[in-house]
């Protein structure tokens, strides 16, 4: 115990819990805490599912059922997706609703009723994780190019910074497998995460001892093995090569240090930033948690156009750093400049609220960094603030907030 380091995420979690206890003043404190953390866990799992590729979702869906206590899962999901917290609003006309339904299935419960040789680990990265010696496997330029091509569109690596991306490439090991070779086996210990460069692999799940059933397959660009590393759980499925394949393997330590620390730091950074945004000041901490998890950081150089007048609106933006120009062209073709936007200002909401084209152009004035929220997440997470944003449109004649 003397060497144990308190995870950096623990203090803010306990602080948020204390606020909720003071706000609700529950008669049964233990039950309240249980329900609070069940809700928080379900939200985190939904974030993972929302960002996962279809093959990963299929694997989770095929393995989640029997391992989860029905009452516990129902309670957790009811908290996570209840509209009582003001964040359950969905666009009924959205074609992606089926994907959200699938995302509601929780991943396998970790280590329920069984022992593995993997020591229990916190999902939150510790100081030891951050300070760990980096894995560097020598590679040729050709190998590095192949890795980059393989992971370029993978959801887990999409938002890493340059240093983290380099660490991933450095740590990956090439693994060649023959047709018929088992790469991972259900119930085994998870030591590696895999990305498929070439080849084909099938995924099988054995439920209740009734034999292996194929649930999905992987080809070039696919990836698997992250669930066991994220949740410290046994492998949820067996993956078998159906043709000669080339995989890139990322070890457990590097995976957790880079990917999970990135997620943790991103959340902490955005939560602190969102507290300073006036529009979001009325939200509860757990509501800002959800927004922080959904935001994506985008950077622009001087003169870059963020949104263009007349275009269809797909995203909502909050300025993290820098300044932006607001330009509107009237019906006579004359260009008008409005008051510039700064850190904490938001734009892009009007086109999403009204389904109308952009009414102005926003252009970076110097280096600009924004937090971006897609249309579907905007509707789901910022629905309760729609009235406030609609009221703000009355100021657009002197200071257009949509831009």
From Swiss-Prot:
**Out of the domains of life, which is the source?**
Eukaryota
| Amino-acid positions noted as binding 3',5'-cyclic AMP 2 in the UniProt annotation, renumbered to this chain | 279-403
Q: Phosphoserine modification sites?
A: 117
Specify whether Repeat is a keyword of the entry: yes
* Keywords of the record: cAMP, cAMP-binding, Nucleotide-binding, Phosphoprotein, Repeat
The biased composition feature labelled Acidic residues covers 87-103
User: Which SUPFAM superfamilies does the annotation name?
Assistant: cAMP-binding domain-like, Dimerization-anchoring domain of cAMP-dependent PK regulatory subunit
Instruction: Using the UniProt annotation, give all residue ranges assigned to the region (Disordered).
Output: 79-125
The yes or no answer to whether the keyword Ion transport is present is no
Q: Which PROSITE patterns match?
A: CNMP_BINDING_1, CNMP_BINDING_2, CNMP_BINDING_3
Q: Which residues bind 3',5'-cyclic AMP 1?
A: 156-278
Region (Dimerization and phosphorylation): which ranges?
Answer: 1-155
**What Gene Ontology molecular-function terms does this entry list?**
cAMP binding; cAMP-dependent protein kinase inhibitor activity; protein kinase A catalytic subunit binding
InterPro entries membership? cAMP-dep_PK_reg_su-like (IPR050503), cAMP_dep_PK_reg_su (IPR012198), cAMP_dep_PK_reg_su_I/II_a/b (IPR003117), cNMP-bd_CS (IPR018488), cNMP-bd_dom (IPR000595), cNMP-bd_dom_sf (IPR018490), RmlC-like_jellyroll (IPR014710)
Which Gene Ontology terms of cellular component type are present?
cAMP-dependent protein kinase complex; cytosol; nucleus
Q: Whom does it interact with, and what assembly results?
A: Tetramer, composed of 2 regulatory (R) and 2 catalytic (C) subunits. In the presence of cAMP it dissociates into 2 active monomeric C subunits and an R dimer that binds four cAMP molecules.
Per the similarity annotation, which family is this?
A: Belongs to the cAMP-dependent kinase regulatory chain family.
Q: What is this protein called?
A: cAMP-dependent protein kinase regulatory subunit
Lineage of the species this protein comes from: Eukaryota, Fungi, Fungi incertae sedis, Blastocladiomycota, Blastocladiomycetes
């Amino acid at each position: 115990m003397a060497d144990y380091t308190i995870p950096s995420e623990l203090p803010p979690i306990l602080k948020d819990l204390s606020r909720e206890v003071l706000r609700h003043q529950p008669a049964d404190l233990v039950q309240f805490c249980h329900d609070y953390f069940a809700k928080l866990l379900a939200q985190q799992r939904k974030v993972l599912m929302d960002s996962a590729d279809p093959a990963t979702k299929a694997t989770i869906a095929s393995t989640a059922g029997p391992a989860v206590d029905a009452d516990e899962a129902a309670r957790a999901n009811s908290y996570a997706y209840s509209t009582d917290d003001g964040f359950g609003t969905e666009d009924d006309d959205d074609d992606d609703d089926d994907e959200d339904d699938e995302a509601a299935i929780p991943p396998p419960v970790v280590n329920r009723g069984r022992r593995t040789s993997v020591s229990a680990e916190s999902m939150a990265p510790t100081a030891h994780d951050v300070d760990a010696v980096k894995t560097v496997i020598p590679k040729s330029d050709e190998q590095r190019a192949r890795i980059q091509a393989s992971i370029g569109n993978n959801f887990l690596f999409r938002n890493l910074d340059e240093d983290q991306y380099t660490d991933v490439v450095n740590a990956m090991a090439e693994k060649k497998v023959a047709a018929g070779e088992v790469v991972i086996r259900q119930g085994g210990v998870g030591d590696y995460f895999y990305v498929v460069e070439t080849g084909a692999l099938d995924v099988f799940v054995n439920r209740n001892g009734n034999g292996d059933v194929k649930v999905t397959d992987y080809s070039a660009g696919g990836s698997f093995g992250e669930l066991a590393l994220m949740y410290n759980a046994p492998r949820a499925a067996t993956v078998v090569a159906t043709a000669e394949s080339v995989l890139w393997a990322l070890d457990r330590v590097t995976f957790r240090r880079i990917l999970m620390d990135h997620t943790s730091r991103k959340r902490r950074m955005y939560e602190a930033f969102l507290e300073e945004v006036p529009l979001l000041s009325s939200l509860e901490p757990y509501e800002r948690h959800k927004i922080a998890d959904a935001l994506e950081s985008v950077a622009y150089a001087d003169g870059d156009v963020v949104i263009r007048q007349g275009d269809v609106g797909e995203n909502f933006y909050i300025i993290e750093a820098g300044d932006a120009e607001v330009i509107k062209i009237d019906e006579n073709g004359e260009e008008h400049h409005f008051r510039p936007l700064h850190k904490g200002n938001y734009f892009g909401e009007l086109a999403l609220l009204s389904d109308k084209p952009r009414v102005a152009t926003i252009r970076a004035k110097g280096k600009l960094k924004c937090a971006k929220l897609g249309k579907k997440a905007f509707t789901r997470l910022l629905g309760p603030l729609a009235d406030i944003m609609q009221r703000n449109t009355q100021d657009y004649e002197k200071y257009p907030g949509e831009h």
